[in-house]
Structure formats: C-alpha cells, structure tokens
C-alpha cells in the first residue's frame, strides 16, 4: 500500500507469509516516499507515482536477479492498494520482466481519485492528491494503468471488494474494461460486502487459493 510514509520492515505481513509458506521468495521494496528515511526521501516520490517509484521497484527486481535470489523466468508482481497500481504499472514500465501481475484493491485510474472514493471527501485528502499525483489531466492519463492496458504483456488477476471506499470498485471495473478493450488475458475475483481488502474468512480463503493457483499456472509451484 502507500504511498506516502508507509514502509516495509520486519513485521508480520499476511500475504508475504502466505507466499513464503508456499515456497515463493518475497521482495518488498521501500520505494521513494516510504517512511522512516527523512523528508527528502518522502518527498522524492511526489508526482512520480508512475515513473520513479516504479523504477525503484524495477531496480529492486534487477538486484534480486543479479544476486541470484530470483529466477528471471519466474517472477510475478503482486500488490494491494497502491501496490495494485504498481503491479500494473511495473509491467508497463518494464516489459518482459514479469510473467504475471496481481492487483488487489488497486488504483488504476488516477483521475478517478478526484471523483470517487473517500480521499477526495475532505480538504486534507484533496490537498494530498494534488501533492502526490498532481492535477494535470495528461499526466494523470499517462500514469494510469487503465489508459495503458495495451502495453500490459502478462496475464493479470484483479481482486477487489465491491464496497471499497478507499479504492472504489469502479477502479477495478475500469481496469477490467480496459483489459477487455485491449484483448488482454485476465482473471477476476470480486466480493460484495468487502471493502479495502477482504475480511470475511471464506472470502480470504478463496482469495489466497486463487492467488496460489494463478502463480502456479504462470510461474510454477514454489520451492
């Protein structure tokens, strides 16, 4: 998730633990705008959602390959919320690097954040959006995965709660429509009553089973 001020550290992460348990190496990158590294680092990601932040993630993958941690023929990108956005954008910015992409409760249309969702509902939220993604329509479109779906070169899995207030269900539907229009392969899982992430136990079981099956299909079983 993110972007501003969040960070990955040595803490329990359900998805990371699940994937590691299934034999997959998990790489979590503290990209620019992550917390705990000072104001300059925090602000370095402003207006860079679809560019420099994605390059930080891509550079992390290149490092993992160079260090022999990752098999370059078996890499998939997964993320939730902003991570869902990044899952789509990294495949666009680094064609050929990934074999599949999974977006969970993701943001796929930046301009829509000014129209739908709870962030735009108060002045602080609107100020946040202007600071981190800007207001220029051309820039927003140029950095929105749903406007660049024709550049996605891997199978996609989209997962979303239909009552999500932070990243509204309309975000996922926009991405799905864009993939349809571009004739790109994807799988879909949405659940009514779920918000920004799944909380119902049965839905989570289905989610993780689908995630595992998708990974096994496209990059093989874990070690």
Please place each PLM-identified region on the residue numbering.
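Short beta-strand element of the alpha/beta-hydrolase
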Residues: 1-2
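Active-site-proximal cap/loop segments of hydrolase catalytic domains
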Residues: 6, 12-22, 28-223
């Amino acid at each position: 998730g993110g972007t501003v001020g969040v960070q990955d550290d040595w803490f329990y992460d359900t998805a990371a633990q699940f994937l590691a348990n299934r034999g997959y190496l998990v790489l979590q990158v503290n990209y620019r705008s992550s917390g705990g590294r000072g104001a300059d680092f925090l602000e370095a990601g402003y207006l860079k959602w679809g560019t420099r932040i994605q390059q930080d993630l891509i550079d992390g993958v290149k490092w993992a390959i160079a260090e022999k941690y990752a098999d370059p023929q078996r890499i998939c990108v997964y993320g939730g919320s902003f991570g869902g956005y990044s899952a789509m954008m990294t495949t666009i910015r680094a064609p050929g690097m990934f074999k599949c992409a999974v977006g969970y409760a993701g943001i796929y249309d930046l301009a829509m954040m000014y129209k739908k969702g709870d962030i735009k509902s108060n002045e602080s939220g609107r100020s946040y959006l202007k600071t981190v993604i800007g207001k220029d329509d051309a820039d927003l479109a140029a950095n929105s995965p749903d406007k660049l779906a024709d550049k996605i070169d891997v199978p996609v899995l989209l997962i979303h709660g239909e009552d999500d207030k932070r990243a509204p269900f309309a975000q996922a539907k926009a991405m799905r429509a864009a993939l349809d229009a571009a004739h790109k392969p994807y799988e879909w899982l949405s659940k009514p009553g779920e918000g920004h992430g799944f909380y119902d136990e049965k839905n989570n079981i289905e989610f993780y089973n689908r995630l595992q099956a998708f990974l096994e299909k496209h990059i093989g079983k874990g070690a």
